[in-house]
């Protein structure tokens, strides 16, 4: 996790998901590695664009990447009355990103990403990433006015991509898609957890791990093969 050159091989995704992985449980870092967490946070902040967003590559903000970046920074965002536990102040960056996401939302409540021609196309995955990010920050994507356009929330937009019988589409005119289904359902799980006062999607500190003792293997190597020493009685007549 401390090798930023290695993490950077995946592009902007690397530090973002490394930070999410590090923070998903109560993991203790060695005393000489406490700098890693703040280094990852700072790395994510350093990738932020001037308009408040994050890009897959280049200098044009993308809703998916901005949503993912916010998911990684949510733990460090200070709500009113909270005390800072870490040295890095992420609030200005998060607030700027939220302002941008409000502006990026389409009139039907959806979000999009770039297609092969450089056009921004609404996709269910883009909506899913924004919904997951808002839930991680304690923001209700169904009721917060910043993320409602023409009476349509991000949740409304996501459900437009739902396929009857189970699953989600990538694009509105497509069939059921694996990645769209995965992200659509975990976005709804994130929203469910928010509504029920549970930890955010990637905060698994509420999971109790119980060790399971493996059964002792049965050693039958010393057993003799009785059949090998058994004489067979000839019962044939004649």
Descriptions of predicted regions:
Residues 157, 169-225, 229, 234:
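Terminal, non-catalytic domain-edge segments
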Residues 150-164:
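Short glycine/proline-rich, acidic loop/turn segments that cap or connect secondary-structure elements
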Residues 237-238:
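C-terminal single-pass membrane-anchor helix
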Residues 35-40, 89-97, 148-154, 200-215:
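Alpha-helical scaffold repeats of the Armadillo/HEAT/TPR superfamily
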Residues 3-37, 47-95, 106-147, 163, ...:
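An alpha-helical repeat/solenoid feature that recognizes helix-turn-helix modules
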